[in-house]
Regions:
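Beta-rich, blade/repeat-based domains predominating
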Residues: 13-28, 57-72, 98-114, 141-159, ...
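Blade-level signature of beta-propeller repeat domains, shared across WD40, Kelch, NHL, RCC1
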Residues: 243-294
Length: 294
């Protein structure tokens, strides 16, 4: 039996089509996230309970703060830099720009600021890949990916977790900060279809991972042994990702409102949620621009 958590609050009424990729910005003390299909990048300020947004021409799969005064955006054909208002957009590196129908999806930095992110096609065929993006270039870590999604690390940085949603599981591998490309994934935990589709995730200081389940109306925590320990019951069905406020046990959760034309059916769908889960999250790093002409 897992501990059931229900006291989830609406943090921001964003009504995203496909809210995704929440990440805490330590420098600005704010949360960034994206609406992939709505083509927007959001910034939520919990101290004022307010948010701002800017639109993008391409679909943003992820937004990552950098070690300079800029944001990194994972867009359809690669990674870009812009300022915090979405201005001065410039491509940093092309990723699969030659593969028709593919786009960047979820991305996250390791403890040394190196970016891991993946691509996907139509969500049904394994046309995507998983990449390490650092030092001015990109290295393919895994091929034949269908829907590249959640990424997380253990608190000691010795394990990397990864989700290709089509596999209905979380993969893991030993990880070395000295040799980050040396990754050999194997299955960590499989999920029944009744859980929904595994999407984004994050990790906590006790070694657990928090997995968002699209179509499952829940975020679930699994110990480092793969045992289900906590279930956050959500008031909406399409749960996409989650991220901790750095240094706290406050978990932010993004959601979607796909194919919900009547808002009365699910009035809270697509909003940003928050809940104190009682376990502190693993801090996330900004993207290190070393090696890039930026």
């Amino acid at each position: 039996m897992s501990l059931i958590l229900k006291n989830v609050d609406v943090a921001a009424e964003t009504r995203c089509q496909l809210g995704e990729g929440p990440v805490w910005d330590v420098k600005e003390n704010r949360l960034h996230f994206v609406d992939i299909f709505g083509k927007k990048v959001y910034t939520f300020n919990p101290s004022t309970n307010s948010f701002t947004s800017f639109s993008t021409e391409l679909s943003p799969g992820a937004v990552i703060p950098t070690n300079k005064s800029s944001l990194l955006l994972a867009l359809n054909d690669g990674v870009y830099l812009c300022d915090e208002g979405g201005n001065n957009l410039e491509q940093l590196l092309e990723i699969e720009g030659d593969i028709q129908g593919n786009r960047m999806n979820d991305a996250k930095c390791d403890a040394l600021g190196r970016l891991f992110g993946g691509t996907m096609g139509d969500g049904n065929s394994p046309t995507g890949s998983f990449y390490l993006i650092a030092n001015g270039g990109a290295a393919r870590i895994r091929e034949n990916v269908t829907v590249s999604n959640g990424i997380a690390w253990s608190p000691d940085n010795k394990v990397i977790y990864y989700i290709d949603s089509a596999l209905q599981s979380v993969l893991h591998s030993t990880y070395s900060l000295e040799n980050p490309a040396d990754i050999k994934f194997k299955t960590f935990v499989d999920f029944p279809s009744s859980f929904g589709i595994p999407d984004g995730m994050c990790s906590d200081v006790e070694g657990g991972i928090w997995v968002s389940f699209f179509g499952g109306a829940a975020v679930r925590r699994f110990s480092n042994k793969g045992i289900l320990t906590h279930t956050i019951e959500m008031p909406v069905n399409q749960i996409t990702s989650c991220a901790f406020k750095s240094g706290t046990s406050m978990l932010f959760i993004t959601t979607a409102s796909l194919n919900i034309e009547d808002k009365a059916i699910s009035p809270l769908a697509g909003n940003l949620f928050a809940i104190d889960v009682g376990i502190e999250g693993v801090p996330v790093s900004t993207f290190d621009l070393i090696g890039f002409n930026a």
